[in-house]
Amino acid sequence: HADWNIIKQVKENVSIPVIGNGDVTSCFLAKKMLDETGCDAVMIGRGLLGNPWLVRECVDYLRDGTLPKEVSYKEKIAMMRRHYKLLCEDTNEVSASLEIRSHVLYYLKGMPKSKEMKNKICQCKNAQEIFSILDEYEHYLEGLIV
């Protein structure tokens, strides 16, 4: 657990900008950190895992109070695909297939059959297999919503 009191104490005792960090998982917590500590900015780490939309949500909320919209399962699956493609560009399919495994549960948190999906993706060795599993899952979710 992050101790925001330490951030506040540092801010009160230095004349340089202070960036707060720790346990920020929503735009509301980013605002709370700014208000409670007086820090000049907020840095987000683990809160972004599986939730890259959090940056946009924080900017919008802090700028004009815009409340975050729920991210749809389609957006989450599209982002997993994009994330995987970027990993492939940065390394190769085999390395990307191994790396994406550590991110899947974060993206799928709170979604039906998330553990089963992670297990399936952990068996994949290339893009074709991963995209096929994601297509299957998206089709499954469409059936639940109709």
Task: Annotate the PLM regions.
Residues 2-20, 24-146:
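Alpha/beta catalytic cores of nucleotide-metabolism and tRNA/nucleoside-modifying enzymes
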